[in-house]
Amino acid sequence: MAYELIAFDMDGTLLDSHKEVLRSSVDAISEAVAAGKHVAIASGRCPRMVSMYRESIPGVRYAICCAGAIVFDLAASRVLSEVDIAPEVVARAIHTADEEGDYVLEVTTGLGIAMERRGIEMAPQCGVGVYKQLYLDTSDIVEDAHVVALDPTARIPKLNFHFVDAAARDRTFERLADADVTITRCEVSSIEFTCPGVDKGTGLASLASKLGLDISQTIAVGDADNDLAMLRAAGLGVAMGNAIPAAVEAADVQVADNDHGGCAEAVRRYLLA
């Protein structure tokens, strides 16, 4: 099979343990682009956060953002497709989370996210302290994120709840299992919500279609729960060496970890083979 598109998850995959892109990854991506291949990022992050890395990896033109809810052209700074969560589902999710424990609300709106300053300061307590500076640099700081989320006219492709307590996260997850929404566990004690049937796998399929490719011509590289659908949907699923067991099981092959050239290995061994 000749693969034409490779999509990399960011955290734990394209980014190393220091949240930086390895030189080996940059070089391999440049080789892929020079060979006429397409390279994309597939992330739970919003377009604004993903765009911050474009200078580090200039060969990457497309991004599957918000866990598949937005397909974005980085070069043109343009949304190619967006799928939003129904307002009544947003309201139910927030009211349920409110009953289960203390959490930080991250609301994706447009190309960025809305967060409260108090919430950003709480990031370390919720297992997402590594993103605190990123939140400060890229978020729209609002007085009350709940007001933003509960506005019935708002377009919200993704919601994130970062709980102080993982048990509260799990209770919320179970209570919303029947909701008309896709729910995924992420980080230490977080959950993210997208429209039903939307995940990185559907985002990958959408991008492939826009590029005139079949999904069988794609490679997906990831390490975590929110990569499972993408790993299964792609023509070739590649798990990182640091991937969780479920990701290894969902993938077809495994490469080195995110600190030791796994992404470069995926490009050279499978995309450019």
Where are these regions (language model features)?
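Mg2+-dependent phosphoryl-transfer enzymes with acidic/Ser/Thr/Gly-rich catalytic loops
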Residues: 1-5, 21-22, 192-273
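Asp-based phosphoryl-transfer active-site loop
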Residues: 3-18
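Short, acidic loop-to-helix structural element flanking the phosphoryl-transfer center
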Residues: 19-37, 82-89, 141-145, 197-209, ...
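Short, structured coil segments at secondary-structure junctions
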Residues: 56-59, 66-67, 75, 177-179, ...
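Conserved acidic, metal-coordinating active-site core of Asp-based
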Residues: 96, 100-104, 108-221, 225
